[in-house]
Regions:
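Internal intein/HINT superfamily modules and their associated LAGLIDADG
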Residues: 1-255
Length: 255
C-alpha cells in the first residue's frame, strides 16, 4: 500500500511539473514574441516623409501628449505612445491620415471631455509606439526646437498659437517652457522668419502664476500667415482660416 501511495504521489508530482513547464514555456514564447515586437517598434523604419518627424517635434513642445509605455521598461528601455486631442475633427484627421499613409498604427477616434470648457467635448486618437516617436519622446525641448522647420512651426502655431484680427500680430504659447527654452524658441522663429524677433511676454494670472508666450510682431506675422494660409488651403482645412487672419469657412460655404 505504501508503494502505491508513493507511486501516486510521484505521478501527481510529475503532472504538476509538466503543467508548470507548459506554463513557463507558453509565458516564455509570449514574452519572446512581445520582445521582438517591441524591438521592431523601438528600432522602427526609416522615415521618408519629414512631415512625420515634424509632427512629432511640434507635439513634443505643443499640443500632444507623450505617454511612457510600461511594457518597454520591463525590457530595459523607454518607449512612448502619442495622444492627440482637438475640437477640429478635420484637422485631427489630417494628422492621423499622415501617420497612417506612412505605415504607422493609430487608434480609432474617441470622444473625450475637454479640460478647457465645462460640458465641452473634443476628439482624440493615439499613435502607437515606433522608433522615431521614442527618440523624440526622450529629447529635450531645446533639442526639439532646434530641429523645427517651417512645417513644424506652422503645426505648432495651429495647435498653440493665435492671430489677433484687428491688430494683425500673433501669439505663440509656451506655458510650461523654461526661460532657456523660451529663448531657444525666439531664436528658431527668427531663424525661419528673419524679419523681426518675437518678444517674450508673460500671462499673469490673478493667483500670481505667470506663463510665458511669444508676441509675433506684425511684420513677421504678415509673412508667416501667408505660409499658414497656403498650408490650410492646400490641405482644405477651411475651418482654421482664422489662424491666418481670414474668416473660417465650412464645406457648405464653399459649395
Amino acid at each position: 500500500m505504501l508503494g502505491r501511495s508513493n507511486s501516486k504521489d510521484a505521478k501527481a508530482e510529475r503532472e504538476i511539473l509538466n503543467v508548470n513547464a507548459e506554463k513557463f514555456f507558453t509565458c516564455h514564447v509570449r514574452c519572446s514574441k512581445l520582445y521582438v515586437l517591441e524591438k521592431i517598434s523601438r528600432e522602427g523604419l526609416v522615415l521618408k516623409d519629414t512631415r512625420i518627424t515634424q509632427l512629432l517635434y511640434s507635439a513634443h513642445i505643443g499640443d500632444g501628449c507623450y505617454v511612457k509605455n510600461s511594457t518597454g521598461e520591463k525590457f530595459g528601455y523607454v518607449s512612448y505612445c502619442l495622444n492627440y486631442i482637438s475640437y477640429d475633427l478635420r484637422y485631427l484627421t489630417y494628422k492621423r491620415d499622415l501617420f497612417i499613409t506612412n505605415g504607422f498604427s493609430c487608434s480609432n477616434y474617441r470622444i473625450t471631455c475637454s479640460g478647457y470648457k465645462k460640458n465641452s467635448f473634443g476628439f482624440n486618437f493615439s499613435v502607437r509606439s515606433f522608433g522615431e516617436l521614442n527618440k523624440v519622446g526622450a529629447m529635450s525641448k531645446i533639442d526639439v526646437i532646434s530641429r523645427l522647420n517651417k512645417f513644424g512651426l506652422i503645426i505648432y502655431y495651429l495647435d498653440d498659437g493665435s492671430y489677433h484680427q484687428k491688430r494683425n500680430f500673433g501669439h505663440l504659447y509656451c506655458n510650461d517652457f523654461t526661460p532657456e527654452e523660451v529663448d531657444s524658441l525666439v531664436e528658431k522663429v527668427y531663424e525661419l522668419y528673419p524679419i523681426k524677433k518675437c518678444a517674450i511676454r508673460l500671462d499673469r494670472k490673478k493667483d500670481g502664476r505667470e506663463y510665458p508666450y511669444l508676441y509675433i510682431p506684425v511684420s513677421t506675422m504678415k509673412v508667416f500667415k501667408e505660409d499658414v494660409f497656403s498650408f490650410l488651403k492646400r490641405n482644405r482645412l477651411n475651418s482654421l482660416y482664422y489662424k491666418a487672419g481670414l474668416p473660417s469657412q465650412t464645406i457648405e460655404n464653399l459649395r
